Amino acid sequence: MNSTTKENKETIRPVFPFTAIVGQEEMKLALILNVIDPKIGGVMIMGDRGTGKSTTIRAIADLLPKIEVVKDDLFNSHPMDVDLMSDENKKTLQDGVALTTSYINVPMVDLPLGATEDRVCGTIDIEKALTEGIKTFEPGLLAKANRGILYVDEVNLLDDHLVDILLDSAASGWNTVEREGISVRHPARFVLVGSGNPEEGELRPQLLDRFGMHAEIRTVKDPELRVKIVEQRTNFDQNPRRCIEDCQKTQNDLKEKIAEAQLLLSNITIDYDLRIKISQVCGELDVDGLRGDIVTNRAAKAYAAFNGQQNVKSSDIGKVITLCLRHRLRKDPLEAMDSGEKVQKVFNKIFEEEN
């Protein structure tokens, strides 16, 4: 048993530690808040090539505690929460049969650009269903990503209808596959993370609006910081095990902080006057719909929980509001101001009495 575990540890590809990543604080914060509260709705990360987008996203999964699942279940079903459980397991539970469980690492699923709809959603064996009357379902990537993270690199190059499917599943928490009158559904609640380079094309505004947060990252200009980043990467490439060991304490501290924030989240309160001001900011920025208001409220609570507070302060809102609103503003070709700066300016104006 021990030798097998040792072999498995040796064969696992080392992941660059999250806490060793230098700079890019906005991207790191967006990922942490989505992990604390997946209902924020995922994050879109846009930035230059070679700025550590993929490295950071893959590193976040390493910070998450193991999750309890129904053993040998195709959908990583939760053993008690019916909203995160397949219909088959739900029926087993209702029949009074105990479910066998096991612990697994939080799934981190990569969605390749060339993926088909069947690969994403899963397929039903129509022939078997018609001839033998057996509903056979081959799970797709959405099933594997349930209760985990689904990462789409170059999401701006993915087919729009696939992005739609991902966003629908992420919002509803369920994936339904229908073929020839036969229907199968399963839980598909995950944190959707997309990344891309704006030079290669933008997402449609309707799709962009569905992402909870939008982080923009730039190439680091400070020479000292660049040298530090190069050193960190060189150390990791030369001796990944040692680099991981050196960061073990900071990794564990952050892991504990995230776990505590997840427990604290449901008790966080946000005063009515602060909620009014959030909606005032959204109104003044002419944000369509109410997604901006909802996500900003959620993100502010997650940020307060991350800092171990019971109540949301205006400074907490200031830290997250740009991430939540910058991609929801209408594009104005004559506007000289960056959308993030515009959000911050309106926030400062409305919250100035408290600052």
UniProtKB/Swiss-Prot annotation:
GO molecular function, one term: ATP binding
Cellular component GO terms held in the UniProt record: chloroplast
Entry binding sites for ATP: 47-54
Catalytic activity: protoporphyrin IX + Mg(2+) + ATP + H2O = Mg-protoporphyrin IX + ADP + phosphate + 3 H(+)
Listed CDD domains: AAA
EC number, as in UniProt: 6.6.1.1
Biological function: Involved in chlorophyll biosynthesis; introduces a magnesium ion into protoporphyrin IX to yield Mg-protoporphyrin IX.
Protein name: Magnesium-chelatase subunit ChlI
